[in-house]
């Protein structure tokens, strides 16, 4: 199937009598309720369920193996190839399926808040609530922009169309396929709305580096003096909590680009976790869930329609989608200058990493490539032990290119703009999980504040004898003994053994990066 034929098929779909284009938020909410796709909550948000797929389905994600990208993609378990033949046949079937629908919903908008680098996109949805979701998550065009909008990438989403693995070359009924040549994302068999968000992020992670822009899975905020901070970290490290600062304005909570102009948000909204959400813990998120917001897999009281954020009956991965302007303390448009400070967050359950360390350029590249944190594996008896987990560049499921490409760009930009990089451990202190305790949040906030205001630049440091990290000896508001992890352990020999064990896990994980420079390995990693 040629690109021309693909465009003809799209044109027919978009010009069919069933296509509802660029409906407003109230119109979409009406459609959701009329079509029985979701419920209205007590705060005016729409609540919808995603069925059996309550999270991303990485084994069902494919990139079409086309001549123009075949030698650029880092093929493997993350970037699984699928043939053009399989894609073309499935695409044709999905289009025929959607043509028969009574209604389709189309959103036109952008990815990328910097007008110089934004990607015009359109999303064709089988579900009205999915269209409301993308309306809130991506960047909404003005009426004037809409008149000249020409989409460069299209998502076609048909959750109720199920693939046949034997015929379609998929691994299950669900599929998320990206064709860079035809500029199409094809999604079916899954109702999880996050697939649309992350597909565009994966595309931007391919397109932006081609323009010498580093795409990043991080949150970002800016201080009153215009100083920009980035927060990288996997789930459970405190990225959302620590980047929400009343004295700093939010640029974005999840996806950013770093160009020669500075930092920009890729999105126009937030997709926040809301398990155990409360007004006391996270007032910004709680208050943003109003009319037009979308709740995913949150249990709602049948009578009062009040959301129960503590109920994880459907999944722990409950989510809320809302536009950036639903939060008070933000920058709009979501662009800012070059980062002054970069924070890598890790929740080290082995309790051996320092609570804060200063990183050299090589160490920053090493820890960026490593993307380390811990996850806790539970047993039926409730006995838990920490497991090291590594997610390259703090976002491996979304990186189509070789990881070293992103790391090299980070190193270049750190050097060019003199950004200060810190590794912050929000995990355990005084022993590993089960012996020690979680790092005091007040101490972590004080350490990050000291990093942001430049105090750590002039603080005396000591080199960690196993990880080679420069550890500050004094941080205002933090007891000195907390800063050196070994001092918080009663059993010093046990600390050393555990630290060497983690250092070896770092080294073992790093063996997969065969294309990185020797400097990153020799100057960036553990020294023992």
UniProtKB/Swiss-Prot annotation:
| GO MF term set | ATP binding; metal ion binding; phosphoenolpyruvate carboxykinase (ATP) activity
So, what pathway does this thing act in?
A: Carbohydrate biosynthesis; gluconeogenesis
Intracellular or extracellular location(s): Cytoplasm
Residues that hold substrate according to the record: 56, 192, 198, 319
Enzyme Commission identifier(s):
4.1.1.49
A single GO cellular-component term from the record reads: cytosol
User: Cofactors per UniProt?
Assistant: Mn(2+)
Pfam families in the cross-refs: PEPCK_ATP
The UniProt note on the cofactor reads as follows: Binds 1 Mn(2+) ion per subunit.
Q: Which GO terms describe its biological process?
A: gluconeogenesis
- Quick one: which residues bind ATP? 198, 217, 233-241, 282, 319, 444
Write down the SUPFAM superfamilies for this protein, in alphabetical order: PEP carboxykinase N-terminal domain, PEP carboxykinase-like
CDD domains assigned: PEPCK_ATP (cd00484)
Q: What does this protein do?
A: Involved in the gluconeogenesis. Catalyzes the conversion of oxaloacetate (OAA) to phosphoenolpyruvate (PEP) through direct phosphoryl transfer between the nucleoside triphosphate and OAA.
Q: HAMAP family given for it? A: PEPCK_ATP (MF_00453)
Q: What is this protein called?
A: Phosphoenolpyruvate carboxykinase (ATP)
């Amino acid at each position: 199937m040629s690109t021309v034929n693909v465009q003809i098929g799209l044109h027919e779909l978009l010009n069919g009598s069933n296509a509802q284009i660029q409906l407003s938020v109230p119109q979409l909410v009406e459609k959701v309720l009329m079509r029985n796709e979701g419920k209205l909550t007590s705060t005016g948000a729409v609540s919808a369920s995603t069925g059996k797929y309550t999270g991303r389905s990485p084994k069902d994600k494919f990139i079409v193996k086309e001549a123009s990208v075949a030698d650029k993609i880092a093929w493997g378990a993350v970037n699984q190839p699928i043939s053009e033949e399989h894609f073309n046949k499935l695409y044709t079937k999905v289009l025929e399926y959607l043509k028969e629908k009574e209604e389709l919903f189309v959103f036109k908008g952008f990815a990328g808040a910097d007008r110089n680098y934004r990607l015009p996109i359109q999303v064709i949805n089988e579900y009205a609530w999915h269209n409301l979701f993308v309306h809130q998550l991506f960047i909404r065009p003005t009426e004037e922009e809409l008149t000249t909008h020409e989409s460069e990438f299209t998502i076609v989403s048909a959750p109720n169309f199920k693939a046949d693995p034997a015929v379609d070359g998929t691994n299950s009924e669900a599929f998320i396929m990206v064709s860079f040549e035809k500029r199409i994302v094809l999604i079916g068999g899954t109702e999880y709305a996050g697939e649309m968000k992350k597909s565009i992020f994966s595309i931007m992670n391919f397109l932006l580096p081609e323009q010498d822009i580093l795409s990043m899975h991080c949150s970002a905020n800016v201080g009153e003096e215009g100083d920009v901070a980035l927060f990288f970290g996997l789930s459970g490290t405190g990225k959302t909590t620590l980047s929400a600062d009343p004295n700093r304005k939010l640029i974005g909570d999840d996806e950013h680009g770093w160009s020669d102009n500075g930092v920009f948000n890729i999105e126009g909204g937030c997709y926040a976790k809301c398990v155990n959400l409360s007004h006391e813990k996270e007032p910004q998120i709680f208050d943003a869930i109003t009319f037009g917001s979308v709740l995913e897999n949150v249990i709602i009281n049948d009578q009062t329609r009040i959301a129960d954020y503590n109920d994880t009956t459907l999944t722990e991965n409950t989510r809320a989608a809302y536009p950036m302007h639903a939060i008070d303390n933000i920058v709009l448009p979501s662009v800012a200058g070059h980062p002054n400070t970069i924070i890598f967050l890790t929740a080290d359950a082995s309790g051996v990493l320092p609570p804060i360390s200063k990183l050299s350029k090589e160490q920053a590249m090493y820890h960026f490539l490593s993307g380390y944190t811990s996850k806790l594996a539970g047993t039926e008896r409730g006995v838990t032990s920490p497991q090291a987990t590594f997610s390259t560049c703090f976002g491996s499921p979304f990186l189509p290119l070789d990881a070293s490409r992103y790391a090299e760009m980070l190193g270049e930009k750190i050097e060019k703009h003199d950004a200060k990089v810190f590794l912050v451990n929000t995990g355990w202190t005084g022993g590993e999980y089960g012996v020690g305790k979680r790092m005091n949040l007040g101490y972590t906030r004080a350490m990050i504040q000291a990093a942001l205001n430049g105090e750590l630049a002039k603080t005396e440091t000591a080199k960690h004898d196993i990880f080679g990290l420069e550890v500050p000896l004094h941080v205002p508001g933090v007891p000195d003994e907390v800063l050196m992890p070994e001092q918080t352990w009663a059993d010093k020999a046990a600390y050393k053994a555990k630290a060497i064990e983690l250092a070896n896990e770092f080294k073992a994980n790093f063996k997969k990066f065969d294309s990185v420079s020797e400097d990153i390995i020799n100057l960036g990693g553990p020294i023992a």
